[in-house]
Each structure stands twice: as structure tokens, then as C-alpha cells.
From Swiss-Prot:
This is Ferredoxin. Residues 2-29, 30-59 form the 4Fe-4S ferredoxin-type domain. The keyword Transcription does not apply. Ferredoxins are iron-sulfur proteins that transfer electrons in a wide variety of metabolic reactions. [3Fe-4S] cluster binds at C8, C16, C49. [4Fe-4S] cluster binds at C20, C39, C42, C45.
Length: 78
């Protein structure tokens, strides 16, 4: 699945939300999150993000890896 990382914090542009064909992207208090159970890995969200915050999980930069777990926890705690 795809993961939204730190550049989204405070930005929350929502272009990704409108683009996602399966409504897997949800708004959190500080950023958007991608539901890993709904994400179909279509990558539609990645190029529309104006702050380049979206990565395929295996390509999340090393200094952003914490967002993989943060993303999972967002949906685990819902």
C-alpha cells in the first residue's frame, strides 16, 4: 500500500482524496492517511500530491519510515 508522510502535516491539500478510486484516504487531525486494507496500489494519489508526501510503502525514505506505523495505527485505533 501507499503511505502519506510528513510533508502532508499541516498541508492537507486533499488532491489525493479526490483522486483515490476506492476512497482509501481519510482525514486525520494533522494529515491524511491511506487505509492499507482498502488501498489497491493503483498509485493515482502519488502524482497529484502537491507536497510529494505519498510513497509506496517499500519506497518510504528512511527518515519517514515511522509514518508506515503511524498510518497503520490510525486505522487500527478507529
Amino acid at each position: 500500500p501507499f503511505v502519506i508522510t510528513s510533508p502532508c502535516i499541516g498541508e492537507k491539500a486533499a488532491d489525493c482524496v479526490e483522486t483515490c478510486p476506492v476512497d482509501a484516504i481519510h482525514e486525520g487531525p494533522d494529515q491524511y492517511y491511506i487505509d492499507p486494507d482498502l488501498c489497491i496500489d493503483c498509485a493515482a494519489c502519488e502524482p497529484v500530491c502537491p507536497v510529494n508526501a505519498i510513497y509506496q510503502e517499500e519506497f518510504v525514505p528512511e527518515d519517514e519510515k515511522e509514518f508506515i506505523e503511524k498510518n497503520r495505527n490510525f486505522f487500527r485505533n478507529r
